[in-house]
Amino acid sequence: MTATTSQPSPASAAAPNDAWLIRCCERGWLPDRLIRAGMRSLMRQRLRDEHAYDGERRAAAYDTLVRELGASPIAIETVAANTQHYEVPGSFFEAHLGPRLKYSCGYYPRGDETLSQAEEAMLALYAQRARLEDGQRILDFGCGWGSLSLWLAERYPAAQIVGLSNSHGQRHFIERCATQRGLTNLRIVTGNVVEFDFDPADTGFDRVLSIEMFEHMKNYGQLLAKIARWMHDDGKLFVHIFAHKLLAYHFAVRDDTDWMSRYFFTGGTMPSADLLLRFQDDVRIARQWWLDGTHYARTANQWLASLDAARPRVMPIFETVYGADARIWFQRWRMFYMAVAELFGYADGQEWGVAHYLFDKRRVLA
């Protein structure tokens, strides 16, 4: 496996080295096809640089990254990360995401699904792979705008669903949706995962599901230990992350050209497909799956098309949030979706993709 701890990430492919070019992109002076071509060029260079290393150097870099994660807090830059994606209100996401407001990869088994169909297909895939049943006590760890929590509450009326978010705005949004739909088996709690812990009387979850949350984390050992404490002895943890098949790296802001890290992923981590397997003191892997990157590329391209169509609805929202920079931020969100599409679509989806894991709680021997 390989890792880099100081070089720019491939997702920074939306960040050309020249700050002037970035300004041109952000102001919409360059056509999308040229912006996308620049992204692909930087991804290609990144992979070329990585594969130039010998095996010994790659292994050493990977071990260094694992040690760095183990010496870190559970998460860093939590305020910045929350602000970057959620300073805009739920109405922005309602304007252009699918009807479930799933702000993560969809599933396209045929390849021609609509965004709505891809949302439903992925949610159903979670239920299958996590081995969900009605009547279980289920935690949605990092519940976002409630796509999974609300879906679970609808599908499993006898289950007790708890969603954990670090955003009070998200909690109020989900609670309002639950009330409108007459759902009484869903509870949302808020807290920063670094400090948050459930009361022991409120633990014992049969299932914990986490969708594109671990990428915002650092110390996976501490995180998994905390989650394991929340689980029933026979409980299972299902994790969905985006990943590279081999590379693992930090999203870091070192200069103005670290565009993705600066505006959308401060403090984040790009895991490799097997990175979580290095942290099994408190959980044990039961199953692992891989979805190629074309699923996320389709998702992001559909988000982009929907965002463009919703521009008249979105711009007043952005003018309230971003003020005089509303037009620039509209283009930044477009570039973000283009970067996601190009990253996961690179090499027909055979470099970056989506990993699913099913973990058992590791039993403590008497």
What are these regions (language model features)?
Residues G135-G144:
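Conserved class I S-adenosyl-L-methionine
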